[in-house]
Amino acid sequence: MTHTLYYKFILGYLLFGFLGFVTIATVSSNLTYEHLIEQKAEALYDEATMIADNCSKVYEGKYLDLATAYPQLDAVATYMKARIWIMDHSGIITADSSRKAAGTAVEGFDPTAQGNRLYTIGRYYGMFDSDVLSVSSPITGNMNTYGYITIHLPISVIKAEQNGFLNIVYITSGIIFALSLIILLIF
């Protein structure tokens, strides 16, 4: 009688560990990913808005030299692990933080496609080989929209950060699971 109860207890313990791992792998993974997407989108949008405000000063009579703007774009892009584009209203990239796409036209560019969402996820009109998180902010002046600041963060960067968080959760749950072995020692 005691052995069968003990085996059932061990089986229940192992089942609990397995279901805990599956729960962490699915629920925690999705929650972490969604949280990181929202967090990164807000940070990118704030940065895009700040850059757009600086670019808008040109239309208030102030001078903006692209030669002096590039180091700032490059520094922000490097810090955020993203690419920053300055685009005109028709979708032609006038400046690129990586200096690869300047002068390129974004085919099918539609600034209203984003709707009221803060961000989009995809390949941004086929301009990237993998999915990116993209945000854009208009460059306005004198009640007109002259262009857009778009910032693109590779989803792989977000996935790497997600995996880092999940590793911490896995290790912590493994330690808790191991510490709960004390219950088996008591019986």
Regions found by a protein language model. Give the residues of each.
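A short beta-strand signature within small-molecule sensing/ligand-binding domains used
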Residues: F128-T140, G147
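Short strand-connecting beta-turns/loops that link adjacent beta-strands
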Residues: H89, G141-N144
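Cytosolic-side ends of inner-membrane transmembrane helices, especially those
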Residues: G12, A25-Y33, T172, I176-F187
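Amphipathic alpha-helical bundle/coiled-coil segments
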Residues: I84, L133-S136, H152
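Helix-start (N-cap) segments at beta->loop->alpha junctions
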Residues: Y59, T140-N142, T150-Y170
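Short loop/turn motifs at secondary-structure junctions and domain boundaries
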Residues: A75-Y79, G126-D131
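Extracytoplasmic/periplasmic sensor domains and loops in membrane signaling proteins
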Residues: Y70, I92-S130
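Juxtamembrane segments flanking the first transmembrane helix
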Residues: T2-I92, S98-A101, A160, N167
